[in-house]
From Swiss-Prot:
Entry protein name: Flagellar assembly factor FliW
BP term (GO), one: bacterial-type flagellum assembly
Function: Acts as an anti-CsrA protein, binds CsrA and prevents it from repressing translation of its target genes, one of which is flagellin. Binds to flagellin and participates in the assembly of the flagellum.
UniProt keyword annotations, A-Z: Bacterial flagellum biogenesis, Chaperone, Cytoplasm, Translation regulation
Listed GO CC annotations: cytoplasm
Any Pfam family the entry gives: FliW
Xref: NCBIfam families: PRK13285.1-1
Entry keyword Chaperone: yes
Region annotation Disordered: where it falls in the sequence: 129-150
Localization: Cytoplasm
Native source species: Maridesulfovibrio salexigens (strain ATCC 14822 / DSM 2638 / NCIMB 8403 / VKM B-1763)
Subunit structure: Interacts with translational regulator CsrA and flagellin(s).
Gene behind the chain: fliW
Length: 150
């Protein structure tokens, strides 16, 4: 059995060890970061719904993300056939959906989730893509504590 190659990456929260299996490739980058393609998901703490989507090319670029289903049950993401091909989707069970999180400094009660621009990851193919939801009922600044997206 082949041994997994490990690599140390620098992040805003210190050094972390990842395996090559943990690298997710974004062929189009992310909105605003089109030139960054390789990322890793880093768990911040064991029971937290939040993760860090860390660029492997830029240690200063780490986006706080969360599973939107931790905050709402009926969130839906639409993917075009072209997006499914880019993500190499064979089965929807391969997909994980994340949304970016903004926590204003010193004001955690004003935390917002970007439901209008989810990040979809094929966990088997290690491919990711940010998929803007055009004509969506979901806002880009959803406050989970007191918003209703509809």
């Amino acid at each position: 059995m082949a041994k997994e190659r490990k690599k140390i990456i620098r992040t805003r929260i210190g050094e972390r060890e990842i395996t090559n299996e943990g690298i997710i490739y974004f062929s189009r980058g992310l909105i605003g970061f089109d030139d960054k393609r390789d990322f890793a998901l880093i768990q911040l703490s064991e029971n937290s719904p939040f993760l860090l989507l860390q660029s492997l090319e830029d240690p200063a670029l780490g986006l706080l993300v969360a599973d939107p289903y931790s905050f709402m049950d009926d969130y839906e993401v639409r993917l075009s056939e072209a997006e499914k091909r880019i993500l190499r989707v064979e089965n929807v069970r391969q997909l994980a959906v994340l949304v970016t999180v903004t926590i204003p400094p010193g004001r955690p009660d004003e935390t917002t989730l970007n439901l209008g621009g989810p990040i979809v990851i094929n966990s088997e193919a290690k491919r990711g893509m940010q998929v803007p939801q055009v004509d969506s009922k979901y806002p880009t600044h959803f406050r989970p504590a007191n918003d209703d997206p509809s």
